């Protein structure tokens, strides 16, 4: 089944996108549903896009939907791949199927009116080169003939009828249209301000560059025939030759050089243009840098880093001044709110004072902790000393108790002596008169035990010794309890 050919610019754009995605079978369905606006497909939301896919019968084939989405993304990001540059002209209602016979216009726009509009209102506007890039055109030089411009197949019945080969038609060739893919386009150059900044930076850097020896350069060119054939003629030109700088720029370019394999439609970035300009300026100052491209590249990048920052900053400031607006990088300060930029030093001072105060409090806490620890150590030492004294007292008490008789009274000789005494002079045992529980001081207990032994051994049967011994025993009693019944 033959696919219908596009009649408008919108249909042609859709045709190219479907052709890129290998989905030309859906072209008729898109046209029948009125889907000749590619911009609508690109800006459609998820639900709207799925609805369009259902209308054209693509919703049931998700892989086809993915291919179409990828082609749409490529068309937005790099329209040069489709040989269809983006323009500000309407995407529909621009007939390319048939031109009015005998009209000196193309696409409904007069050449003179285009020149006026391109010079006054839209200086960057490019006429779409649909016919020049998508059709096979056969034009005669100075002859009047009818040519056929086939969009896809020469045998197709729908042909675009050609016209007289006028000067206006010749001006629509790809070389004269100034397409974005042309590396010699006027936009592939820095503006005057940026070039001036590069020149100033190179002037400052020039005294620091090492001086090249011309004899070494000639020796290098003599040994390298290929390099000599390429740039040898530049060293033979005089400085007054107007073509010397042009040749230097041609062979000093780092990016997008005439012999580089750069993809069609890819523009040079601001960084690349700056590096190329810096390399050209450096080679003008020192022609020998043409033979040392690695060193030239490093120097050009150094210049680019400095120039790009300064020029971009200055341009932004100038644009903001022209619009009488605040810089996008400046913090907007509302009325009634403090200036936080001015309060930063104050906040810093306050934070510093707080840190010093916290440090002082920390030292005080450390001192208090040390004092507390010393108090605890002293208390512990006193407690240990008290425990030691208590243990000593208990030991002395146990020692004094062990030295006494097993029944708790006086020694056995005392009892024996009492047995020899008359009945009327006998006294009850100390055990019968001494309570069970009493507390005795260590030293007095020891004194009591020694005195008791001496009295019991020296005054057996003597009555006068009893009161003294009884007095001594009465002094030792602290707590009186009933006698033991045993």
Swiss-Prot record:
* Localization per record: Nucleus
Molecular function (GO) terms listed? transcription coregulator activity
Region NCD2: start and end of each range?
A: 220-309
Give the source species.
Mus musculus
Q: What is this protein called?
A: NGFI-A-binding protein 1
- Tell me which family the UniProt entry assigns to this protein: Belongs to the NAB family.
Q: Where is this cross-link: Glycyl lysine isopeptide (Lys-Gly) (interchain with G-Cter in SUMO1)?
A: 332, 479
Indicate yes or no for the key word Transferase: no
- Region feature Disordered, mapped onto this chain: 160-187, 398-438
Positions of the UniProt region annotated as Necessary for nuclear localization: 306-337
Result of altering residue 64 to Q: Loss of transcriptional repression
GO biological process terms on file: endochondral ossification; myelination; negative regulation of DNA-templated transcription; regulation of DNA-templated transcription; regulation of epidermis development; Schwann cell differentiation
Gene Ontology cellular-component annotations: nucleus
Functional description taken from the UniProt entry: Acts as a transcriptional repressor for zinc finger transcription factors EGR1 and EGR2.
Subunit composition and interactions: Homomultimers may associate with EGR1 bound to DNA.
In which tissues does this protein get expressed?
Widely expressed in adult. In day 16 embryo highest levels in forebrain, thymus, salivary gland and cartilage.
Q: Which Pfam families match?
A: Nab1, NCD2, SAM_NCD1
Asked if Transcription is a keyword of the record, the answer is: yes
Comment on protein domains: The NAB conserved domain 1 (NCD1) interacts with EGR1 inhibitory domain and mediates multimerization. The NAB conserved domain 2 (NCD2) is necessary for transcriptional repression.
Encoded by which gene? Nab1
Q: Where is this region: NCD1?
A: 4-82
Q: The cross-link Glycyl lysine isopeptide (Lys-Gly) (interchain with G-Cter in SUMO2): at which residues?
A: 126, 129, 143, 211, 332, 354, 368, 372, 453, 464, 476, 479
Q: Where is the composition biased (Low complexity)?
A: 404-417
**Residues bearing PTM Phosphoserine:** 171, 182, 327, 405
Q: Which InterPro entries match?
A: Nab1_C, NAB_co-repressor_dom, NAB_fam, Nab_N, NCD2_sf
